[in-house]
């Protein structure tokens, strides 16, 4: 398998494994225990499979100890075996698996050369190759936000969008779980923007940002600067993904 094939394979198979854990153990475990079991099963599978197929590559995983040797490595897999754990624990559909390969010498956007996201409960798998154009939508701007931590600036952002695009009326907020699940909704034409100003980590946004860019969307921080990956501090304060003209309208306001 080439790297992109491997990324999609890892996303799909990890998704299958964690979905099976949820199906098998939902009745016997508490929500917290089920989330931990899914996280662990997904992480262990990724560690084992990457060791088999790419033994020289480094791994940055939400569930693993951070080996800072990755900072001098040429290839680093940035993965989240289970993004949206609380939704997974309650058997909700909006959890996902994120897989991204960062390469030091690459000229690719974000230096990410391969990426895959699966949403197991919806049987969705997306990669770097666009399936077709994203459907146009002339109605209210649909903004995906965290189901638990919506941006504190969201009222100001909505007002600016309403002023900039009056013909589209009042923006509509759509709470949802995993970043990967949110991205699939934008790619399907069911939403226009994703905004996070509450902060998260590289494994939350690396795969979604790379796939978004490959599909012609803009992914950046809230001020319009590029996202940077494989950093010593893996915290990412803000991010926005969406149609370029909508993202520009927001980043211009935030500068």
Write out the residue ranges for each language-model feature.
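Generic detector of well-ordered alpha-helical packing
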Residues: 40, 63, 81-84, 120, ...
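DPxDG-like acidic metal-binding loop motif
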Residues: 71-130
């Amino acid at each position: 398998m080439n790297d992109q094939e491997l990324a999609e394979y890892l996303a799909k198979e990890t998704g299958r494994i964690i979905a099976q854990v949820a199906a098998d153990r939902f009745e016997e475990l508490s929500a917290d225990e089920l989330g931990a079991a899914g996280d662990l099963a997904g992480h262990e599978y990724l560690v084992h499979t990457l060791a088999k197929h790419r033994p020289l590559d480094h791994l940055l995983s939400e569930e693993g100890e951070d080996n800072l040797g990755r900072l001098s490595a040429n290839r680093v897999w940035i993965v989240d075996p289970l993004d949206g754990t609380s939704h997974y624990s309650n058997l909700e559909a909006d959890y996902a698996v994120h897989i991204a390969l960062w390469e030091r010498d690459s000229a690719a956007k974000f230096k990410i050369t391969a990426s895959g996201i699966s949403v197991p409960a919806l049987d969705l798998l997306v990669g770097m190759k666009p399936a077709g154009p994203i459907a146009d939508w002339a109605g209210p701007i649909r903004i995906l936000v965290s189901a638990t931590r919506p941006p504190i600036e969201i009222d100001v952002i909505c007002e600016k969008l309403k002023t900039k695009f009056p013909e589209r009326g009042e923006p509509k907020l759509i709470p949802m779980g995993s970043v990967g699940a949110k991205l699939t909704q934008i790619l399907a034409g069911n939403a226009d923007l994703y905004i996070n100003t509450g902060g998260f980590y590289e494994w939350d946004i690396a795969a979604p940002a790379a796939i978004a860019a490959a599909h012609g969307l803009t992914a950046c921080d809230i001020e319009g600067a590029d996202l940077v990956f494989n950093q010593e501090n893996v915290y990412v304060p803000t991010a926005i993904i969406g149609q370029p003209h909508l993202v520009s309208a927001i980043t211009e306001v935030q500068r």
